Amino acid sequence: MDAFFVDLGRRVRGRWQAVDFSLAAFPGIARTALEEKPPATQVELAALTRSFLRDDEQPFQTASGFGQPELVVFDDPRFYIQLLFWLDGTTQIHQHEFSGSFHVLAGSSLHSEFAFAHVRPVTAHFRLGDLQLTGTELLETGCTVPITSGAGSIHSLFHLETPSVTVVVRTHSDPGTGPQFTYLPPHVAVDPFFSDALTTRRLQLLDVLDRTGAEDFAEVVRGMVASLDYERGFFTLQNCLVALQERGEWEETWDVFAKKHGALAAYAAPTLEEIVWR
């Protein structure tokens, strides 16, 4: 294990214990510890990566799928420290179900913050509203930013260099702050960790019908959209939009969704357009 991050983890744990593990205090504790001894000036990244590849004595590695990749460099029952490598330019707009602080170890990023206003819950895992940009800043190597859990801290990062690497000191999970929504601008929030296996299989089967040239593909999609609830209907349209456009069947299919859901359909149209554009 890397000695620098062991020391960082012990300092954070000691200070957090001194305030009885207050979740509200944790972002500030993590930020102060990162700024006292900035990893950007203390850690030699090439040496750390080579040591990680050779040394078997490492903290437990999660299967979070976050980062490209993620390295866990300190683990505690209440929090952990991760290094996140980023090879792609951008992250999705998202909120967190954890709190802490992150520090730019290498590279630089454009950090954008958002608010989600006029929220209309559709299900526990799907919301409608208005996503609004509230600020943008350039994060250069050495910058540290606090993370608060929940909808009060919605953000995205556009990484300007490859790789960009961030150090994250974070809790495992903050009770009552989920789901950890991802935002599809300008109007939809979805829970990316909610798994509806039946819908997933149906969308995969629709892909088969599309790729094999099924003549009734659009008719089948319209029948589904006419009977499904808003959430599953939206995901069906999202999955099939390009294929329907290529077949000249999109407008008729959209009309089925719009007729079924009335005024609420207005949230879906610009969001689906944005998904295609991106």
Predicted features along the sequence, with ranges:
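Charged, amphipathic alpha-helical linkers/stalks
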Residues: V167, T171-E219
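Short beta-strand His + acidic residue motifs that chelate non-heme Fe in jelly-roll/DSBH
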Residues: Q92-I93, H111-S112, G135-L138, I147, ...
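Conserved short histidine dyad/triad with adjacent acidic residue
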Residues: I81-Q95, T148-G150
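Intrinsically disordered terminal extensions flanking catalytic oxygenase cores
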Residues: L209-R278
